[in-house]
């Protein structure tokens, strides 16, 4: 490698090291910036969470306070309204001592049941008492009247006051007793049902007609029927009552057109000579009278309206007569119905959601009223105390005793304000100058703070810069080698080589400058060219470094961003300090001074109230407490002799009474005791004899019953024993026969199936001998080996099943016993004794089990040894036929063949590799069977 290549390699390595170092500086700066940003973001998130919690707390607190305040205001308002209404009602009590607490409870109960405001019921109760409803101690009659009107108001789509005043006006107009309330309500409800009107409309207008109707003896039922007829035809309720009033007035007033027409129409009838009032008293319906007048008008070729002096009365007559007469009759009949139409309508109107919500709302208001009633007296006392205190304070101010103190406080506060203004006046210019200096020197302050920020960043980059220095030093050796090579070659150093020499300290700056100036002067022609080239080279170098070195580019970008961000934060902090912190502090200072007046005022009030309370307590102690003590002591000593005498007399009386009671008790009960003792001893011998006789009889009965039972049960036991032993041999024989038969059947089937299997195997082999002579031995060998493996493998399968069964038993026992972890109960109470118990049971049964197995195997062996006793199967028959056929074939082959090799070719044997047995004929099968039986016995004895 040439010296130039080595130098170039050193420079490249130096550049790579510098890039790596710059990347480390960039990474350190970026990590610091990320950490700063993360900290700022975490702080901002924490502040945001605190702001959310604070806002939520403010909202919740405001909601709670608002709800509580609204509830208190609502309760206070409802309670005050109810109190005012009931107080207003109490002015109607007169001399009657009404149980006001009971009355208030009844009103609240009615409000809760109907959903009508308690204050409205109280106001209506006042109107009811004003209209003449009687006042009693328990107010039972009045509250019954209120309850009925509350129901009518719901059923008639109006308020309770309208329903009540209408009812009261009708009762007063007709001079009815309050007991007629149901009758009036029924008529009003039927009028609403039959006409186009409501109880509310009737309540507002009935007073226009009821006085006239009552004066004319026109019943309220006829008023209702008339208004129902008229409103059903479209006449508004107010006009209908006006028209009906005009009709009644004209018919009843003497000398009117209607009165004369009535007298003319009744001539020659049973109503002749009677006035309208007399006809009404006689119970004649209005429509019948109007029909008579209509007939008279038609005779005179007039209309019914001509029979009246006013158009209003004529309209009413037309609505109640002629074709409308039948409807009037039906309406009049409906007014006297026996059905409780008010309660029915009330029940329907109360079963709506609006009604239920109203009841719930009034229940809450009534709860507030009850709370208010409990608190109103303490609140009254507190208000009176406050009024008294304010009055005393006003007197103190007016009398001059507090005037001087207030003046002194005002003067002191004025002096304090003046002092603050003076201090502020002196300090403000200095603060303004300081602010101006800060504003003027803002860039300098910012640069200082930026320097602090940059210094903190560069602290983490020092190590990277040290690494950069080491990279430059690392290139020194290569440069030296390069220079030696250049010296040996006798060449002149280039500008790049000179730069490398300077950077590695192998060439001084003066030497490099001299060499570069010489080269530049020679090439560019003077210092100006050199300057241009230098600037161009610097710019080109920076551009090349920016374009080719990502570490340098990132470092510059991050450094600039950090400087810009730090400057922004520092300058923002300075601006916030002078635009927010200082004004806020000034506002807080002003607020503190503005609140000082209130604080001094409250402090003075507290001091004054404390002195007033103390003085009142002292005065009360000497004017109330001590006189009360003295009075109580005097009363106590005054009552002492009487109480002592009373106590002695009471004790003496109790003693005498006790003595009399004891004597009376003894006189009464001692003879009874003696009589009972005498009677007891007189009856004792007879009772003993009766008991002995009864006992002896019961013992005899028991003995007889026991003997009889013993005879019966002894006979039954003996019979059962005889029967048992009589049937025992048969049962044993039956069991043995069944058992032996099952064993024999099993052995027979096994022998038969074994022979059949062997014969089928041999038959199959014989059938395939001609085509596969070489595979016969392998087939026989594999079949027998598979059979044997199946027999011996059954032991492992059986063992696995037994293990699974035992494991299932243990798991089920553990779950049923509640054991889910190693337990001392299972270890000490079950585990210790379980193997011993199994062994004891196994040891007690092993001899019988071995004997049973030996018997079974012996029987099976005997049956296998004597196959002639077994019924010959198809397989055996085919096997014998095959053997006979083979023997015959061998005989033919022996006869026809002249060579000895034919016997070897045709007598093909089956060699089964199992104890060296060769199967040729049936005897070989028996031999093979015996060997298999022996192996089975050995396998069973060894425990498969």
UniProtKB/Swiss-Prot annotation:
Family annotation (InterPro entries): Phage_tape_meas (IPR010090)
Ranges in coiled-coil conformation: 13-52
Stretches that traverse the bilayer: none
GO biological process, one term: viral tail assembly
Entry keyword set: Coiled coil, Viral release from host cell, Viral tail assembly
Record function comment: Serves as a base for tail tube protein polymerization and acts as a template for tail length determination.
Similarity field: Belongs to the P2likevirus tape measure protein family.
Entry-linked NCBIfam families: tape_meas_TP901 (TIGR01760)
Name of the protein in its database record: Probable tape measure protein
Organism of this sequence: Clostridium phage phiCD119 (strain Clostridium difficile/United States/Govind/2006) (Bacteriophage phiCD119)
Lineage: Viruses, Duplodnaviria, Heunggongvirae, Uroviricota, Caudoviricetes
